[in-house]
From Swiss-Prot:
Organism, as annotated: Caenorhabditis elegans
Domain TSP type-1 intervals: 24-71, 236-292, 294-510, 512-572, 576-635, 811-873, 932-990
MF GO annotations: signaling receptor binding
Keyword annotations of the record: Cell projection, Disulfide bond, Extracellular matrix, Glycoprotein, Immunoglobulin domain, Repeat, Secreted, Signal, Synapse
Start and end residues of each Ig-like C2-type domain: 637-732
Identification of the protein by name: Protein madd-4
């Protein structure tokens, strides 16, 4: 009955304790610890202590910190966590590694605070799993932003006036290397793009970022992008060739040329880059041979008759380009020439003013005394009449008169024809043809005899100013007699020549300034700036697209560069808040604060600013003036002392100070004091081997800042550091083993432990305890033995149990050590074994909970221990070779060598991947060597290229070599005088003269002659491909070409 009463009472006690309010069970939260990182995502921790035996909830909570992206680009923690070992699987927060030596797998957790990807929310890694981060910054928090941007709100406090757009100081990322370039069509982030400022919607009062929909009713600010540096990626560079020029010469075999560029295309813009970036590709030919089939030549017809019957006239002929349309205008034969009729024109017949009656009247002449003063009569022909036929052959006529001239008045006098009968009479009729008759197919007039002929006139303007255009010769119909242009209908359409054109302006286009459209204005008010791209470019192809132009350096354009910016939105702005730069952090390490000034300012239409009273700006949008800053943990001091402490085997508890090294027995309880003065000791924290210590039943930091370790184990060995606002000192603990004898129950009186505050003590009567104890000892009920040994410390109960003390024995049952397990080299392995607690009473042995042995003051043996440590392989380098015998690399400088291998301490060689490749010693090193001198070496002169005459040439080989070894020395002879590699033939006796050949006889009267004394080299190499060679060695090349056939 009393036993049942006891059980009911215990259950009632547990039920009452479970209803204690958490606020009374927990102490206040500690201050936040410093962030585990300074950038890239870390965590900060906060602790609270349970004041009662039963507390619900967590004793530690975490928040994210240092979320700013690190400036220096580093590899992801998931990629480096295995420390060079093989990565078997890579989770977001856990990575499985495999030892390259043993093949064993082991699990590593990613650092807490490392960002990870959750389904819908922001998340970070915590304790090996991806945990949601609440809007309050706490990991695993259930707080979220509501529709109004309030953290943990209910969506009923929206005020759109509180939310504004804000241009952050962060920009979108530029491509930092060629692997980041994801789109070469211009749509993605590519080579020389721009970086945009990030615009976010924020709560104007708190400054927190909120969903963008809360700023949907406000105009999003226009931002000004900044250009990204251009990346030149050799793997994406290519050769680009311009269009070919026309074949030169225009008839027969010749050459044509084109420009070849190394380019890189981005955003539909082709940029000219140095040729070295295209070395992996095949460079297109810049020159090639060609054959032009358009070989026009001039042909001239017969001269026409002289147009004058006396004095000087004109003769004309037809000149045409046949066999093509590219005849050289400079070599065009003359189409007109002067001619002489053979009879001087002493009288201007066109001015004769006839008056037959007056001058033939005898009375007129009769009055003159001297008839001898008259000139002798002569026949004078008049102008030809028009042709009797408008087309085809006709007749034209003229009159012939006998006249004389009075030498005094110079007036002509018409005489009877009989006065001139002794003179030869000129023709009175002549055949003529105005034009060919179109319907008269059987016309026998040649083209040269036609009165109207087709002629080519001046060239039209070139169709292009560069890169090769076309121009045409204007076709005209000319009246042969006058040389004037008439309508085309006057010329024979059947004889109309083909259209004639020629290439023109084949030179490259000059560089020019290529401009884009202006961007949007950088300011919505207050005089902003619009920008555009202005680049020096050159057109290299007539095709459209990115390959039509290449971008050059600005100094290649000789005209004034157009402006890249222009002023826009010249209107005044309303008053707004302006912030100054943040001050320096108040602390150089750990957490501090920094401040900045904030004032109200207006910007006028000209862009000038003026401070205004704060009341003119919106107080709800005023930026913060103070914020927290952190620059990582404070620097470490050196070890405070070199004290060495060795524990005495009789000691069970020890108190140590900071400094030195202590070697202790396992199982010892330790207290280490932190020498902090004038500091809040509740804020003291400890680290073991660089990792912050978390309180538990085995190890904890007390309220006064001291570190306590209960029943120390072998794995507790390490370096312990004490921190306030900086490192105060450290101590190194090592442990050694001791024997583990069986422990008997100590039933001696012990001082009563005072009860904890708010904890009730269960009262048990003497008779109940004796009855329960007798049942336990006789029936060996393990559960009741545990209840007896953990019962309240009642003096009367202990007196009743004292008589059984010698018969109740508790001891540890210890198993065998396992094989040594070692995850990786340079880290000690470990061995494990099983332990269990056994109680012996009246000869009977039972396995019981381990807590029974521990409660009997028996030291618990360690379940693990360190084992042999296998060192990592290391680099071993041999001695350097002698510099004097090594290969020369430049003048007075050689390169010595040595072997570098990866070996274990026992001398075993392994693959180099097992050693740290970043610390591999150099295998080569430059060293001074006086023997490293280069010189030109020549071979003997070769035989003469000619067996006769004086134009022969001798050749020899040149090579730059090291004097000491005779090996090739590359370009190390460039500063020395280069010996001649060719000379005119030198012989003891002059060579006999060459016999004339058919080729020589053929060229004897021609202008094709050799102009260089080295033309005989062509006979050795049979190379006349170059136009310059053919011009300077015309005779030799003719001989070579004839010899081929």
């Amino acid at each position: 009955m009393k036993c049942s009463y006891t059980v009911v009472f215990l259950l009632f006690y547990l039920l009452i304790a479970s209803f204690h309010v958490d606020a009374l069970s927990w102490a206040a939260w500690s201050p936040w610890s410093s962030c585990t990182k300074t950038c890239g995502g870390g965590v900060s921790r906060q602790l609270r202590r349970c004041l009662t035996s039963k507390c619900s909830g967590e004793s530690v909570r975490f928040k994210v910190c240092a979320q700013k992206t690190c400036e220096s680009k580093s590899r992801l923690a998931r990629d480096t966590i295995c420390g060079g070992e093989e990565i078997v699987s890579r989770g977001q927060c856990e990575v499985v590694c495999r030892s390259r030596l043993t093949g064993a797998n082991f699990l590593w957790r990613v650092d807490d605070g490392t960002p990870c990807q959750a389904a819908t929310s922001r998340a970070v890694c915590s304790k090996g799993s991806c945990q949601i981060v609440g809007c309050d910054g706490l990991i695993s928090s259930s707080f979220r932003f509501d529709a109004c941007g309030v953290c943990g709100g209910r969506g009923d406090t929206c005020d759109n006036g509180k939310f504004i757009w804000k241009v952050s100081e962060e920009y979108t990322a530029c491509a930092s290397n060629c692997d980041d370039i994801v789109d070469w069509s211009g749509a993605g982030r590519s080579i020389a793009s721009t970086s945009q400022p990030i615009v976010v919607c924020v709560n104007a009062i708190t400054g927190r970022v909120v969903p963008e929909k809360l700023c949907a009713d406000k105009l999003r600010p226009k931002v000004e992008a900044r250009p990204c540096p251009m990346l030149i990626c050799p793997s994406r560079c290519r050769w680009m060739a311009a269009d070919w020029t026309e074949c030169v010469p225009h008839c027969g075999e010749g050459t044509r040329k084109r420009e070849v560029y190394c380019v890189q295309t981005a955003h539909n813009v082709t940029v000219h880059v140095p040729d070295t970036f295209c070395e992996n590709g095949t460079r297109p030919a810049a020159e090639e041979n060609c054959v032009s089939t358009s070989c026009g030549r001039w042909e001239a017809g017969k001269w026409s008759k002289c147009t004058a019957s006396c004095g000087q006239g004109v003769r004309r002929r037809h000149v045409a380009c046949v066999g093509g349309s590219d005849c050289d205008e400079g070599g065009r034969p003359r189409q007109e020439t002067t001619c002489y009729a053979g009879i001087p024109c002493s009288i201007a017949t066109n001015s004769l003013d006839w008056n037959d009656r007056a001058y033939l009247d005898g009375n007129t002449f009769g009055s003159m005394d001297n008839h001898n003063d008259w000139q002798a009569p002569r026949l004078v022909a008049g102008e030809w009449s028009t042709c009797s036929s408008t087309c085809g052959t006709g007749v034209m006529s003229r009159t012939v008169e006998c006249v004389a001239v009075n030498p005094i008045s110079s007036a002509p006098i018409k005489l009877p024809m009989s006065e001139c009968q002794d003179q030869e009479q000129p023709k009175l009729f002549e055949s003529c043809e105005v034009r060919s008759c179109p319907l008269q197919e059987d016309s026998k007039l040649s083209e040269d005899e036609a009165p109207y002929q087709w002629r080519y006139g001046d060239w039209t303007q070139c169709s292009a100013s560069c890169l090769g255009g076309k121009q045409k010769a204007a076709l005209k119909c000319i009246q042969v007699s006058t040389g004037k242009s008439v309508q085309w209908s006057q010329c024979d359409a059947r004889r109309r020549p083909p259209e004639k054109s020629r290439p023109c302006n084949q030179h490259p286009c000059p560089p020019f300034w290529l401009t884009s459209k202006y961007s949007d204005c950088s300011m919505s008010c207050g005089s902003g700036t619009a920008r555009r791209s202005v680049k020096c470019a050159q057109t290299v192809s007539k095709t459209d697209g990115a390959d039509a132009h290449i971008v050059l350096r600005d100094d290649r354009c000789h005209f004034k560069k157009p402006q890249e910016t222009e002023t826009c939105n010249v209107v005044a702005c309303p008053a707004t808040w302006v912030t100054a730069q943040w001050t320096e952090c108040s602390r150089s390490c750990d957490s501090g604060e920094r401040r900045r000034q904030v004032w109200c300012e207006i910007r006028d239409s000209r862009g000038k600013t003026q401070r205004r009273p704060d009341v003119e700006c919106d107080a709800n949008t005023k930026p913060q003036t103070v914020e927290v800053c952190s620059f990582g943990s404070c620097s470490r001091p050196e070890l405070l002392s070199n004290r060495v402490f060795e524990q005495n085997a009789e000691q069970k508890k020890l108190t140590l100070g900071i400094g030195g090294v202590a070697t202790l027995y396992q199982g010892t309880s330790i207290k280490i004091k932190c020498p902090a003065k004038k500091f809040d000791k509740k804020k003291i924290y400890w680290k073991k081997n660089g990792k912050k210590i978390k309180n538990d039943a085995h190890i904890k930091v007390s309220a006064n800042g001291n570190l306590r370790v209960f029943h120390a184990r072998m794995e507790d060995a390490g370096v312990y550091e004490c921190f306030t606002d900086r490192l105060q000192g450290n101590v190194t603990l090592n442990f050694k083993y001791r024997d583990f004898p069986a422990s008997r129950v100590d039933l001696a009186p012990k001082p009563q432990i005072p009860s904890t505050k708010n904890r009730q003590r269960v009262q048990v009567s003497k008779e109940d305890v004796l009855r329960e104890q007798a049942s336990v000892l006789h029936k060996m009920n393990v559960s009741l033995i545990e209840a007896l040994l953990t019962a309240p410390n009642d003096e009367k109960a202990r007196e009743q149990l004292r008589k059984y003390g010698n018969e109740l024995v508790a001891r540890w049952d210890i198993g065998h050590w396992s094989e040594c397990r070692q995850k990786t080299c340079h880290v000690a392995g470990y061995q494990a074994r099983g332990i269990s607690c056994k109680v012996t009473f009246h000869g009977e042995i039972r396995n019981v909970d381990n807590s029974i042995c521990e409660s009997l003051a028996s030291v618990r043996p360690p379940e693990t221990r360190p084992c042999h440590r296998e060192d990592c392989p290391r680099w071993e380098a041999s001695q350097w070779s002698e510099c004097s015998s090594q290969r020369c690399v430049s003048s007075m400088l050689a390169q010595k060598r040595r072997n570098v291998t990866c070996r274990f301490t026992n001398g075993t060689s392994v693959d180099i991947q097992h050693c740290d490749i970043t610390n591999r010693p150099a295998t080569t090193m430059d060293c001074p060597n006086q023997n490293c001198k280069a010189e030109w070496r020549t071979s003997d002169w070769g035989s003469c290229s000619s067996e006769c005459g004086t134009g022969g040439v001798q050749l020899r080989l040149l090579s730059c070599v090291w004097i000491s070894s005779g090996r090739p020395a590359g370009r190390n002879c460039e500063q020395m005088r280069r010996p001649h590699s060719a000379r005119a033939c030198v012989a003891d006796e002059p060579l006999p003269p060459c016999m004339p050949t058919a080729s020589a006889l053929y060229q004897r009267d021609a202008s094709c002659q050799d102009q260089s004394r080295f033309c005989d080299i062509i006979k050795l190499f049979h190379s006349c491909d170059s136009l310059e060679v053919r011009q300077k060695c015309c005779s030799t090349c003719t001989f070579v070409e004839r010899k081929k056939f």
